[in-house]
């Protein structure tokens, strides 16, 4: 389990104005998934709510917003088993891990950042919310008036983009729209919402996204061919 504590109480960062000196060592991010058990069985929706609460409020306590954004993107990538991308995000933001986990991190100024374990992996006693429809093909939307709304997506480059979306749209369709607007190939895009990787066949209405919510898009562009 590394140095994370398998409990739900959130560890807040150190008090503002008193950054802790970071450890002298920096270990690469470990690939094994941290295991923990919740004090009570929780659903996927409850886990998302806890994560949203943490990510929405953590930057208000201490630390730099760009570091919190990088840690959030790295946590999403690691949970999706894209450890190479997660490590690249950490290295790009000059974040060090004295124990090789995201439970305790330091920026280049020596500020300490602590992530609760529930932001890094689901509990072993997570309650799965299955329905009969999940095993079937996604139903085609019935012909009706398309009700569009502006969907805000935040790229891992830090840029915010607004797409014209409707609830029946699939993530695959929105990836192609982002490609037409920003030139980012759909195969380079990984979409996350509330810590969950969204597949191309996922419809927006299935994510329970609400107005003013933001979808994270991690861009994993392949390196250019060498001469």
UniProtKB/Swiss-Prot annotation:
Region (Disordered): 1-42
Domain Ubiquitin-like stretches: 149-224
Entry-linked InterPro entries: DC-UbP/UBTD2_N (IPR032752), DC-UbP/UBTD2_N_sf (IPR038169), Ubiquitin-like_dom (IPR000626), Ubiquitin-like_domsf (IPR029071), Ubiquitin_dom (IPR019956), UBTD1/2 (IPR039869)
CDD domains membership: Ubl_UBTD1 (cd17120)
Compositionally biased tracts (Basic and acidic residues): 24-38
Biological role stated in the UniProt entry: May be involved in the regulation of cellular senescence through a positive feedback loop with TP53. Is a TP53 downstream target gene that increases the stability of TP53 protein by promoting the ubiquitination and degradation of MDM2.
Alphabetical list of PANTHER family matching this protein: UBIQUITIN DOMAIN CONTAINING 1 PROTEIN-RELATED
Name used for this protein in its record: Ubiquitin domain-containing protein 1
Organism: Mus musculus (Mouse)
Higher taxonomy: Eukaryota, Metazoa, Chordata, Craniata, Vertebrata
């Amino acid at each position: 389990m590394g140095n994370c504590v398998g409990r739900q109480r959130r560890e807040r960062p150190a008090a503002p104005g008193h950054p802790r000196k970071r450890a002298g060592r920096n270990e690469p991010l470990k690939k094994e998934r941290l295991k923990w058990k919740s004090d009570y069985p929780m659903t996927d929706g409850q886990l998302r709510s806890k994560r949203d609460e943490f990510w929405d409020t953590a930057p208000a306590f201490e630390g730099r917003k760009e570091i919190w954004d990088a840690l959030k993107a790295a946590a999403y990538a690691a949970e999706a088993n894209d450890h190479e991308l997660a490590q690249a995000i950490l290295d790009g933001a000059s974040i060090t891990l004295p124990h090789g986990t995201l439970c305790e991190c330091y920026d280049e100024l020596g500020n300490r950042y602590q992530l609760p374990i529930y932001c890094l992996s689901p509990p072993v006693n997570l309650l799965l919310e299955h329905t009969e429809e999940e095993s079937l093909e996604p139903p085609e939307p019935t012909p009706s008036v398309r009700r569009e709304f502006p969907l805000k997506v935040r790229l891992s480059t830090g840029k915010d983009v607004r797409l014209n979306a409707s609830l029946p749209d699939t993530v695959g369709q929105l990836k192609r729209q982002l490609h037409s607007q920003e030139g980012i190939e759909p195969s380079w895009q990984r979409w996350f919402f509330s810590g969950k990787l969204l597949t191309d066949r996922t419809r927006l209405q299935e994510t329970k996204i609400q107005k003013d919510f933001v979808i994270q898009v991690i861009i994993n562009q392949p390196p250019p061919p060498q001469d």
